Regions:
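Leucine-rich repeat
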Residues: 1-3, 20-26, 42-48, 64-70, ...
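Short, T/G/N/S-enriched strand-turn elements that build extracellular solenoid repeat scaffolds
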Residues: 13-20, 35-42, 57-64, 79-86, ...
Length: 143
């Protein structure tokens, strides 16, 4: 049973209409992938989805499966996520160096780990879920 698919660095093709293996648990896209994903039907059992360095597409209307526990967005991702309907199962969320949109974000109640690699804006008005155990900011954070 296929559980992991890892697309190489140069992969940058549409994944709309792809029928994923039902057993898929881990899906990773290489550094050049930058295709729209709002219409993608994700595998029902996928737990971890990782986007590479150049991914920078809106995700506000993505229908994430209930099984997702970890989402990782690469360096270029910089779209607002305040309208994203995160799955309740999401425990780990990672954003890369270009992400600057924490205010107004609806975070899942079970989120335990949040990484914002180069976030450097005030966080005094950011609402953190009670479940959060690990919060990481990069070296440039000074607020």
């Amino acid at each position: 049973m296929l559980e992991i698919i890892w697309f190489g660095a140069d992969f940058d093709q549409s994944i709309d209409g792809v029928v994923w293996p039902a057993s898929l648990k881990y899906l990773a896209f290489g550094k050049r992938f930058n295709q729209p994903i709002c219409s993608v039907v994700w595998p029902a059992a996928v737990q971890h989805v990782r986007f590479g360095k150049r991914f920078n597409q809106p995700i506000d209307s993505v229908n994430w499966p209930a099984s997702v526990t970890c989402l990782s967005f690469g360096a270029s991702f910089n779209h607002p996520v305040d309208q994203v309907d995160w799955p309740a199962s999401l425990a780990r969320l990672e954003f890369g160096v270009c992400f600057y949109h924490l205010h107004g974000v609806k975070r899942p109640a079970g989120l335990q780990h949040l990484t914002c690699t180069c976030y450097n804006k005030p966080i005094d008005r950011v609402g953190w879920p009670d479940s959060l155990k690990h919060l990481a900011f990069g070296a440039s954070f000074d607020h």
